[in-house]
Amino acid sequence: MSERKEGRGKGKGKKKDRGSRGKPAPAEGDPSPALPPRLKEMKSQESAAGSKLVLRCETSSEYSSLRFKWFKNGNELNRRNKPQNVKIQKKPGKSELRINKASLADSGEYMCKVISKLGNDSASANITIVESNDLTTGMSASTERPYVSSESPIRISVSTEGANTSSSTSTSTTGTSHLIKCAEKEKTFCVNGGECFMVKDLSNPSRYLCKCPNEFTGDRCQNYVMASFYKHLGIEFMEAEELYQKRVLTITGICIALLVVGIMCVVAYCKTKKQRQKLHDRLRQSLRSERNNMVNIANGPHHPNPPPENVQLVNQYVSKNVISSEHIVEREVETSFSTSHYTSTAHHSTTVTQTPSHSWSNGHTESIISESHSVIMMSSVENSRHSSPAGGPRGRLHGLGGPRECNSFLRHARETPDSYRDSPHSERYVSAMTTPARMSPVDFHTPSSPKSPPSEMSPPVSSMTVSMPSVAVSPFVEEERPLLLVTPPRLREKKYDHHPQQLNSFHHNPAHQSTSLPPSPLRIVEDEEYETTQEYEPIQEPIKKVTNSRRAKRTKPNGHIANRLEMDSNPSSVSSNSESETEDERVGEDTPFLGIQNPLAASLEVAPAFRLAESRTNPAGRFSTQEELQARLSSVIANQDPIAV
């Protein structure tokens, strides 16, 4: 009842004050102006958003010269920094702070301060703005302290218009409400992009609500909630995604580039490989053509099956390589007798015969027209014995013998006297050479061949000889040593019978076996005409088989070689003429080229007669006895015709 009376009294007092503004206040007493001003206590208030609040700051002193100041959260509210919805009204002895349409931003601690000459005093109160519809207002009973020092705070009572307040109880009223978007002026209530809504209630004053984004919270969306973190994470996620895309693009580009390079390399390799194959094929074809041309040039025209028994002594005087005189002497002494060694300076005769020869080149046979220069043995070589016939060391001219043995043999042959020129054997030789029935080919022309150089065509002294059967060419190196020595026919038959295995074991030649011709029938006639006795048969050993040899071309009459061999002659050699006469008389009758009728028969008979045994490669058959060598040489030397010479 007292508060109501006070309120009524206040209202009356206000009216009185308004009516009596021009009248001075009566002085109640002298002691009142001397006291410092005191402020009444202000009460804290809680209100909904959009409501109206009033804070009053009153003093018990009626001193006219008082100044009032308001502070919010320690900051003075004046015309410059106070919000638009806040107003301050000054009255004598009191001051009011009115908040129209309170919002969440208006929440805070408000303080009122009075300033006078007598002293200063202050009072504070808290204002809370609630968004919900439930509004609770609690007001505590105010206690008046009549005597409070200026230093102690002064409580100010806060009253809310339109609300019933009591000192001891707090009541809350609820009613129906609805949300309405705030006007444009009121949208500033929400910050940071929040949406403003106003709650209107019939029983309660209107209030404001804010719908904040996810990054912000608070009454007005003023608080950030992990905003920077979300932003940072978003940036990182975006950067990571961009980096991932860049990496994927980079790796893809590298793979495509490698694939393109690989394809280019494969294509280039294939092209170069084809080009190389083409070049190799061309080179091979060119090499093959060159080889075929060389082989054709070397071989000449081919004849597949020539008669192997058609044997000739091929004298080829042209060699591809220039050989020194010493090498020529050694090789010719090893292989054959040089016909220039057995002719004298006064009696020489040469003939040129063109006959088909037989040779081998790379396993093929070829027929060429060769000019065989055969020179008859002169009577100057009558006796070639190095010692007595009893059985001293005798030299033999064989395929593997050295040049020393041949030199010594030729030296002894040169030094023997010309004792067989006037012998009866020479007459027989003349008869054989001059009888028309025998048809002995005698030519009186010198050899001229494109294959023989002028220096090797004939010896230094002009001479004439009869044609002599040539020697067959052998494809084996061991048989390329033609011997102009022969044995009697009966000895040949016996030796061929005693050595069949030896002939078949060495140097098997299927061409001679398959295509060999039978021996000439003239040989049988000669065997009947010229008979020999068994006393001249030497020790049986493998007969020497003379075959057609390519090295027969080296049997060229070289006078220089003969002179060099004559320089090596030994004057101490001794010869026995009596023994050689008897042996030459018997063996000379079996010489095949003395009784031939035509060159064709000679070529057919010479092959089996002058066949060299394959046992020459056998080391045991390399040496022969002196009787056989002497018989062969004497048969050739003794039958020389002194008249024809």
From Swiss-Prot:
Disulfide bond sites: C57-C112, C182-C196, C190-C210, C212-C221
Pfam families listed in its UniProt record: I-set (PF07679), Neuregulin (PF02158)
PROSITE patterns (UniProt xref): EGF_1 (PS00022), EGF_3 (PS50026), IG_LIKE (PS50835)
Ranges facing Cytoplasmic side: 269-645
Record note on quaternary structure: The cytoplasmic domain interacts with the LIM domain region of LIMK1. Forms a ternary complex with ERBB3 and ITGAV:ITGB3 or ITGA6:ITGB4. Interacts with NRDC and BACE1.
Family statement: Belongs to the neuregulin family.
Protein name per Swiss-Prot or TrEMBL: Pro-neuregulin-1, membrane-bound isoform
Organism field: Mus musculus (Mouse)
Species lineage: Eukaryota, Metazoa, Chordata, Craniata, Vertebrata
